[in-house]
A protein has these predicted regions:
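Proteins that catalyze or organize thiol-disulfide redox chemistry
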Residues: 1-66, 79-80, 84-86, 90-92, ...
């Protein structure tokens, strides 16, 4: 996997941090990653490390000023995507670029 640009979020009304589901995955992740890298956060509401990591990722996205977008996927509500991506532990974070995953990690990591 090749390295990805640091996380970022632009202002101006664009949906740069958003939730998606099986119906929006192709547009929100695959197609969007052809324009700008997309960080995908696989999480669940009962996951303590997910609740810690999510806000830290969102801050990093905002701080990078539009370099990337972030999409959050609740694995309890979207088991099909989790299965397709072979998610076995959460939090699991993948960076997509040009329509494919290029980097990722599993578990909460310190800022």
């Amino acid at each position: 996997m090749e390295p990805i640009l640091s996380a970022g979020r632009a202002n101006g009304g664009a949906d740069l941090v958003k939730d998606t589901d099986i119906n929006g995955f192709m547009t929100d992740v695959i197609e969007a990653s052809r324009q700008v890298p997309v960080i995908v956060d696989f999480w669940a509401p009962w996951c303590g490390p997910c609740r810690q990591l999510g806000p830290a990722l969102e801050r990093a996205v905002r701080d990078a000023g539009g370099a990337v977008r972030m999409v959050k996927i609740n694995i309890d509500e979207n088991p099909e995507i989790a299965q397709q991506m072979r998610i076995q532990s959460i939090p699991a974070v993948f960076a997509f670029r040009n329509g494919r995953p290029v980097d990722g990690f599993v578990g909460a990591i310190p800022e």
